[in-house]
Curated annotation (Swiss-Prot):
Belongs to the pole-localizer TmaR family. The keyword Cytoplasm applies. Disulfide bonds: none annotated. It comes from Psychromonas ingrahamii (strain DSM 17664 / CCUG 51855 / 37). HAMAP family: Pole_loc_TmaR. Pole-localizer protein involved in the regulation of several cellular processes. Coiled coil: none annotated. Keywords: Cytoplasm. The lineage of its organism: Bacteria, Pseudomonadati, Pseudomonadota, Gammaproteobacteria, Alteromonadales. One of its GO terms (cellular component) is cytosol. This is Pole-localizer protein TmaR. Transmembrane segments: none annotated.
Amino acid sequence: MDNLLELVRNTRRKNKLKREILDNEKKVRDNTKRVDLLSNLLEYIKPNMSPEDIKCIIENMRDDYEDRVDEHIIKGAELSKERREMNKKISSFKLKEIAK
């Protein structure tokens, strides 16, 4: 019975990891779009249109978004690794049960 509970736990964790990975990929995509938007915005702002401080603020915002993208990419890799480990545990459990 404990083995069955472990299988259920691992399967549920695997499904949760799938959802988290999809959510994380969406965050990467969204923040990448923001980085592109801010990069384009920087190209259009001219010194005679607005003060240099605005450019500095936008550059800082872009850097923040780039950092977020990097963090989400790292998190995605960690979640994928854990999902693969869960798949191995589940497969191993199924093989043990079949062998019984």
